[in-house]
């Protein structure tokens, strides 16, 4: 089975992006920490090249109860607990970007509901997509990740 899988993916090519001082990178992260976990090398490469970078977080990551329950040793989480968790995740994301020497003035938090985005799109697709589109159009990126 593994050899079959390896044969199937053998055609894949890894593309390493190149950046320069004219590059405008827009990184869209579903939650805080996704940018650091998935794209920190891309961010570092773009920063070294002098590219302009904006990071947009779609949610605050406030509705991920399992790590919060474990860390706080609290089973039932109130809305204020979740809001506090989202604020903590925002602060951690900004700290991670600062560690990469990133200008946090180029960070946007859309604050859309974590684990509620599908429902929001079903209820009010146009308004939701408008918020996301404005983050893209307002930046005029040359690359979107």
Question: For each of these PLM feature ranges, what is it?
Answer:
Residues 1-145:
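Active-site beta-strand->loop->alpha-helix modules in alpha/beta enzyme cores, enriched
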């Amino acid at each position: 089975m593994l050899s079959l899988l390896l044969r199937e993916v053998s055609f894949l090519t890894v593309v390493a992006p190149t950046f320069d001082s004219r590059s405008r990178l827009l990184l869209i992260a579903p939650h805080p920490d996704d940018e650091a976990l998935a794209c920190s090398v891309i961010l570092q490469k773009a920063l070294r090249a002098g590219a302009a970078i904006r990071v947009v977080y779609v949610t605050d990551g406030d509705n991920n109860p399992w790590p919060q329950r474990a860390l706080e040793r609290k089973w039932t989480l109130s809305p204020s607990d979740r809001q506090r968790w989202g604020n903590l995740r925002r602060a951690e994301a900004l700290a991670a970007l600062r560690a990469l020497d990133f200008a946090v003035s180029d960070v946007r938090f859309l604050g859309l509901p974590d684990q509620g985005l599908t429902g929001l799109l079903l209820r009010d697709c146009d308004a939701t997509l408008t918020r996301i589109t404005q983050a893209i159009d307002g930046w005029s990126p040359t690359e979107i990740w």
